[in-house]
């Protein structure tokens, strides 16, 4: 049996730009793509924390170190700059692999800089990690 499992998640990133007239996709900082084990063209689900919108698109690599999370194409009608989003990728795997697989969960600060990487989708980093308090409200002191 094949199972579809959580493969990667970038948790509570801030949308930095939206371009309605781009052909589609989500632009993600190359550092975050690497941390989350996302490939150019990989399918991702975007969950907008602010308005509840959910959509499926594909990832394109943004400038390394820029913190860019750019919503492109028609999705820009649903997700806007400043919105908090969760970016999720799923993988299909055999049952045995699924039972042992550990997803990549990337936590970011208000500037979309990585502050932690883990494997437990229910875990929130300890507050002794610089920037972790922003996971509860990443807009603190950011805008």
Swiss-Prot record:
Q: Which residues form the active site?
A: 25, 58
Q: List the PANTHER family hit by this protein, alphabetically.
A: ASPARTATE 1-DECARBOXYLASE
The protein's name: Aspartate 1-decarboxylase
Q: Which reaction does it catalyse?
A: L-aspartate + H(+) = beta-alanine + CO2
Q: What is its EC number?
A: 4.1.1.11
**Could you say which protein family the record assigns here?**
Belongs to the PanD family.
Instruction: Give the organism's phylogenetic lineage.
Output: Bacteria, Bacillati, Actinomycetota, Actinomycetes, Mycobacteriales
Biological process (GO) annotations held by this record are:
alanine biosynthetic process; pantothenate biosynthetic process
Q: Does the keyword Repeat apply?
A: no
GO cellular-component term (any): cytosol
| Cofactor, how bound (note) | Binds 1 pyruvoyl group covalently per subunit.
This protein's source sits in the domain of life called Bacteria
Instruction: Give the main EC class.
Output: lyase
- Entry annotated with the keyword Acetylation: no
**Names of required cofactors:** pyruvate
Key words of the record: Autocatalytic cleavage, Cytoplasm, Decarboxylase, Lyase, Pantothenate biosynthesis, Pyruvate, Schiff base, Zymogen
Q: Which residues carry this modification: Pyruvic acid (Ser)?
A: 25
Q: Where in the cell is it found?
A: Cytoplasm
Organism of derivation: Mycobacterium ulcerans (strain Agy99)
As for what it does, the entry says: Catalyzes the pyruvoyl-dependent decarboxylation of aspartate to produce beta-alanine.
């Amino acid at each position: 049996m094949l199972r579809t499992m959580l493969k990667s998640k970038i948790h509570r990133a801030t949308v930095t730009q939206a371009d309605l007239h781009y052909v589609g996709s989500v632009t993600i900082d190359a550092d975050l793509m690497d941390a989350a084990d996302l490939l150019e063209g990989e399918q991702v689900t975007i969950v907008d924390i602010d308005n509840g919108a959910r959509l499926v698109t594909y990832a394109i690599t943004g400038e390394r170190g820029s913190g860019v999370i750019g919503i492109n194409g028609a999705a820009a009608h649903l997700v806007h700059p400043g919105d908090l989003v969760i970016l999720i990728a799923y993988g299909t795997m055999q049952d045995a692999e699924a039972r042992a697989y550990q997803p990549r969960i990337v936590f970011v600060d208000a500037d979309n800089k990585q502050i932690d990487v883990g494997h437990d989708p229910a875990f929130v980093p300890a507050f002794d990690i610089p920037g972790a308090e922003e996971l509860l409200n990443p807009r603190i002191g950011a805008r």
